[in-house]
UniProtKB/Swiss-Prot annotation:
One of its GO terms (cellular component) is cytoplasm. This is Methylated-DNA--protein-cysteine methyltransferase. CDD domains: ATase. The gene is ogt. Transmembrane segments: none annotated. Its EC number is 2.1.1.63. The keyword Methyltransferase applies. SUPFAM superfamilies: Methylated DNA-protein cysteine methyltransferase domain, Methylated DNA-protein cysteine methyltransferase, C-terminal domain. It is an enzyme of class 2 (transferase). Belongs to the MGMT family. Involved in the cellular defense against the biological effects of O6-methylguanine (O6-MeG) and O4-methylthymine (O4-MeT) in DNA. Repairs the methylated nucleobase in DNA by stoichiometrically transferring the methyl group to a cysteine residue in the enzyme. This is a suicide reaction: the enzyme is irreversibly inactivated.
Length: 174
């Protein structure tokens, strides 16, 4: 199922889309409805490629409100973890997502290298897991930055900057 809702955040429209079946299978967001729908199609294709059964039949859900509450800091990321299905996620990716969500709190960032060191893996492996994160906002991949600057973000640099600034992050260099 798919739930889509528009919220106002800091004078901006934020469209949140959640694919779910029992629990959250994937999340996306965008500044426009059209952009969100394109991202949802891409997310559904990604999930299906990982053998996740996805339906894009629209159905209202409290999951969009849950993601919004995490986005604005009303609910801690970690508290939303039980709502994620982790379907189609590898054991390594799940370990990265859970560690990041539990240890890198709102208003802080971590470098790819520091995250890799904490998990005893390589920065490249961490970067790959961040790129494949189907749960942005709840699993705060936007808080992972490069030593030289903001780094990459699958949904776009403008979106990453927006999220970091919303959380009060002023500097994002390691």
């Amino acid at each position: 199922m798919l739930a889509v809702e528009r919220f106002g955040v800091n004078g901006r429209d934020i469209w949140i889309g959640v694919i779910f079946h029992g629990r959250i299978q994937g999340i996306s967001f965008a500044f426009t409805r059209g952009e969100l729908l394109e991202r949802i199609r891409n997310l559904a294709e990604f999930l299906r490629g990982r053998d996740v059964r996805v339906s894009l039949d629209v159905q209202p859900s409290n999951y969009t409100e849950l993601v919004y509450r995490v986005l604005i800091g009303e609910l801690e990321n970690e508290k939303a973890l039980p709502e994620l299905s982790f379907e189609g996620v590898t054991p390594f990716e799940r370990r990265v997502y859970e560690w990041l969500t539990k240890n890198v709190k709102r208003g802080t960032v971590i470098t790819y290298g520091s995250l890799a060191k904490a998990l005893e893996t390589s920065p490249r492996a961490v970067g790959g897991a961040m790129k494949r994160n189907p749960y942005p906002i709840i699993v705060p991949c936007h808080r992972v930055v490069s030593r030289e600057g903001i780094g990459h973000y699958n949904l776009g640099i403008e979106e990453k900057k927006f999220l970091l600034e919303l959380e009060g992050v002023k500097e994002w260099t390691g």
